[in-house]
Amino acid sequence: METTNFGFIASLLFVGVPTIFLIGLFISTQDGEKSSFFSDSSKGKLGPKR
């Protein structure tokens, strides 16, 4: 019981966290310019601007 429950929670986090991150990144890029998705993600979206 405990091992299956832990595996279910682990798999849920493993799938859910990147999905939420990608959805948030997609929404943040949709807020700005749609055409500059790749340039924004490679420049200052993932890290702090210096």
Curated annotation (Swiss-Prot):
It holds the Pfam family PsbM. One of its GO terms (biological process) is photosynthesis, light reaction. It is found in: Cellular thylakoid membrane. The keyword rRNA-binding does not apply. Signal peptide: none annotated. One of its GO terms (cellular component) is photosystem II. The chain crosses the membrane at residues 7-27. The keyword Transmembrane helix applies. InterPro entries: PSII_PsbM, PSII_PsbM_sf. This is Photosystem II reaction center protein M.
